[in-house]
Structures are given as C-alpha cells and as structure tokens.
Amino acid sequence: MIATGGVITGLAALKRQDSARSQQHINLSPLPATQDQKPVRRRPRADVVVVRGKIRLYSPSGFFLILGVLVSIIGIAMAVLGYWPQKEHFIDAETTLSTNETQVVRNQGGVVVRFFEQHLHSDKMKMLGPFTMGIGIFIFICANAILHENRDKETKIIHMRDIYSTVIDIHTLRLKEQKQANGLYAGLLGDTEVKQNGSPCASRLAATTLASFSGMRNSFRVDSSVEEDELMLTESKSLGHLMPPLLSDSAVSVFGLYPPPAKATDDKASSSKKCDTKSIVSSSISAFTLPVIKLNNCVIDEPSIDSITEVADNLKTRSRNLSMDSLVVPLPSSGESFQPAVTLLPRNNSVGESLSSQYKSSVALGPGTGQLLSPGAARRQFGSNTSLHLLSSHSKSLDLDRGPSTLTVHAEQRKHPSWPRLDRSNSKGYMRLENKEDPMDRLLVPQTAIKKDFTNKEKLLMISRSHNNLSFEHDEFLSNNLKRGTSETRF
C-alpha cells in the first residue's frame, strides 16, 4: 500500500511538473509577441471634429431660459426669508423705548426694510419660496430643452448639407471623368477617320481598273500618267450619266467603282492627292475581285457557233475609240446650251434622217460588242481570275459600266415583261420564228429633226427609248444574219 501510494504521488508530481512546464511555455510564447508589439504601439487617433449647431440665446427659448433663472432666484430668496434663523430678545423698559425709536427710524428708512421686517420669519415665505423656485426651475429646464433641440436641428441640417455637397462633388468628378473619356474616344475616332480618308485613293484605283475591264480594252496595262486618269474619270462620268440619278448617286458609290457625278468635280479639285497606279494596280486586280452579282433575272444572250468564231477577229481589229465613242451617250451639262438630238442620241423615234447613217455605223459594230458579254468570249479574253467585267452583263437595266448595246430586249418582252424566255433557258428546242411579221418589229419612219429645248425628264425618256430601240434592232440584225431557214416557234 505504501508503495502504491508512493507511485501515485510520484505520478501526480510528474503531472504537476508537466502542467507547470506547459504553462511556462504558454506564458513564454506570448512574451516575444508582446515585446514585439510594444514598440509598434499605435499612435492615438486624432480627435474627431464634431460639427454642431450654436445655442441661440437670442430666441424665444433663450428668453424663457433667462426668465426661469430669474423666477428660481426669486423663489430661493423667498425661501431664505421664510427660513432665516431667529434670536431671543430680553424685554426691558429701556430696550422697549429704544426699540420704539428704532421702529420710527426704520419706518422713515423705506419700504424694502419694512417688507423684510414684516415677512421675515413668516409662514408665507416658507410656503411661497420653494413654490416659486420650482416654477423657475421648470421654466429653465423647458427652455434649455428647446434650445438644445434647435441646436440638434441645425446640426442635422449641417450634416445634410455636407452629404449633399459630397454627392455633388462626386457627381461633378464623374462628369469630368466622363468628359475626359469622351474626349479621348472622340480623339481616337478622329484619328481613325483621318486614317480612313486615304481609302478613296484605293477605291479610285479600283474604279480605274474596273473601267479598264468593262470599257472593252484589249490590254491589262494601266498608265500612271495624269492624262490617263482624267480620261478614265471622264469615261466613268459618261457611263454614269446613263444611269438613273438614284442608282448613280447611291448604288454606284456603295460599290466604290467610281464616285458620284456631283463629287467628280471635288475629286478633280483635289489634284494634289494623286495616287501611284503602278504599285497598286497589280494588287488591286487580285484584291478587288468581286463575286459575280446578278442584279436582275436577265440572262446573257448565248452566242451561236458562227458568232463565237468571229469574236476573236472582231476584237483584234476593233479599235478602242470606235467602240466607245459610237455607243456612249453623254449627257450635256447644265451650263452649256442644249445641242441638237443628232449629236446626242444614236437612235430615237423623233430625230431626223441623219440618224440612220449614224445608226448603221453603230450597228456595224454590234455583233462584236454584243458578243463580248458571252461567257466563252469572256473566258478567252479575261481568264478565270477576273470576274469584275461580268458585273455589266448580269443586269437588265442600265448597269454600272455597260455599253448602250450590250443587252437585247424584245418587243414582246417590252409589252409582256412577265413572259418566260424559253429560248434562253435550258429548253434548247424552242427557237424564235422569224417568218412572221409584227407591226412592233417594223422600224418607225424617222421624222425631220427639230431643234428644241428639252427638259430633264424628256432627256431621260429619249435616252431610254434610244437604248431600247438600239438593243432591239441589234438583236434583229443578228437574227437575220444567223437565220438558216429552220422552222422556229415564236411566243
């Protein structure tokens, strides 16, 4: 038992030692932290300035405050008179006489001394003194409360003004930041616009290359001289006058082929911004190859075998001036006087006999110019990489760079535009019958030329009629040459 008791006491001592060591470790571990934290004592915070309103004594509440103080002072004085201590007097004759004399003197002294003599040690003062003192204290407390409430209202108003001022300042700062950001964005936009101003130069070069393709030129060379550029611009203007004003102003400028007629003078005026065509034409031919766009449902006239064989010879022997000058119909300027219709229109129902010779010269060039739009001729002439010249052959109306006699429109199609063209579709068995005659196919007898001033609408009508008559008679001329006595069906 003694041994077991000794073992238990030893274990208890060991546990105490372990607990003491653990406590020492616990006490020692925060010591370095406290030692480290002692030099890093935080400085006392600066006193927070509390903004408060003023206590305005020059107010009704201030008046009542002063009144309460005075009433309480009067009450205190009344209580003092009532509770003032008394002294014991011995009654003697001498003293009585003396007292009587003194009373007479006091009566002669004044009202205040007599009031004190009467109310001193009186019960009224003992009762009214504390009552008046309480009334004065009550008035004082109420006036003080009202004064502090007014001060709190002023402090609230001051805080609200501070809040409003901070909000307004933040708003103005945000507006300034937004203005600065907008200014930077506008500056970036201005830089981009200045950078984009150089793009019309490339579009002009593309327009010259397109004009070279669609203008029936036999070579791909483009001279970099100023005279060639001006010639290309005048040709594009003359072709643009054939279009309606809406198409020439909006649609053509969107494609970027040539600038609108109104802006051509501006482009001439800015002659300082000339572009070098040698270095960009080769890249523009490959970069500006637009896909073939079909603007209307009009199909290209399919050439016959004989006409296909004659295309190469006609293209080699044809000159550029004859093909362009005989077919282009220029629009006279508004500043100049109107010229007679003989020099303006190649074919019209209201012109003189001199037009017939001009029409013959233009029709003599018809087969080559009409067959230039055929797929076979286009493939032989331009190859597979250049598809821009086909833009002029896929439109039934006046296209971008098309000659006046590129497409044929029949009289039946003019009368009935909704009829299907079976001879141009996949049904190859149907062909037109030329044996029958139609009064619409006959040429009208030309009238005598009359010099007359026409309006703009009449000029546009004359141009459209001349274009329709020229294409119709061109088709008639081709059909008469290709007729081989076969039976044809006509719708």
UniProtKB/Swiss-Prot annotation:
Glycans are attached at residue 100. InterPro entries: DUF2371_TMEM200. Residues 21-37 have a biased composition (Polar residues). One of its GO terms (cellular component) is membrane. The keyword Membrane applies. Residues 21-40 are annotated as: Disordered. It holds the Pfam family DUF2371. This is Transmembrane protein 200A. It comes from Mus musculus (Mouse).
